[in-house]
Amino acid sequence: REIRHIRCDGYYDYQVARPMLCKVTGRRRILWPQTTFYAIDVAPSTTLYAQIAPEPNYRWNDYCRQSMRIAEELDVRHIVTMGAMFADCPHTRALPLDISDQQCQCDMDREYSGPVGIPTVLDCMACEEGFSTTSMWVSVPQYLGSDECAQATMQMLAALSDRIGVELDPGDLAGKAEQWKAQASVLTRCNDDLAQYVKHLEHDYDMQEKADQVARFGAPAAEQLVREAEAFLRSRGK
């Protein structure tokens, strides 16, 4: 159910985030970009408040401060920011998911330096104001050229379930994720260069998985990783 809104002309460039024309009870109405907060009761003692909006074009500091005030009014105990980004990752593997808590940075947090979006600004401001926070980012294959990805949504939902300790119903996401994978596989089969590119991504992904195992299990796994890397290079004629 809708419980709050943030409405302000000063946040949006309407040539970028355009208003929408629709019909409501037979009459034409213009819907302007705005932020809507929804209350979702997921357990007798747990309510999620979802903040959904187009990313503002202007006045991010003021926008984030308004968001923090609403969080205080709703007595929010923990703020989770979620985002997706294009990356070099294969659709044939689990999508990379980076999760960082207020006191525990993920690899992406430690390594990244550059432009950020509104989720990062909200996360930083929430930390500064004393909220407990978690940041979640999922990577989606850039070669598909689409930001609609049911697999990413399903993985984020599972991660959120783990964080709050409540199993959230994925609905029909599993079926949509399989359809997304199937469509991506058809695309790669129709393009030899793309298929070869995905094969390289798969190898890099698998090698990173093995490198993570090395970090956990030590020398025997390291020796196996070296042997597999040498075999791959020989197969490439290098």
Task: Please provide the spans of the model-predicted regions.
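Internal, conserved structured core segments that host functional sites
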Residues: 46, 54-102, 122
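A conserved C-terminal secondary-structure "cap"
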Residues: 144-238
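Hydrophobic/aromatic beta-strand patches that form the interior of the parallel beta-sheet core
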Residues: 4, 49-51, 80, 132-137
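Acidic/glycine-enriched edge-of-secondary-structure segments
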Residues: 17-29, 83, 105-113
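N-terminal short beta-loop-beta anion/metal-coordinating cradle
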Residues: 1-55
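Short strand-loop junctions, especially beta-strand C-caps/beta-turns
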Residues: 53-56, 139-141
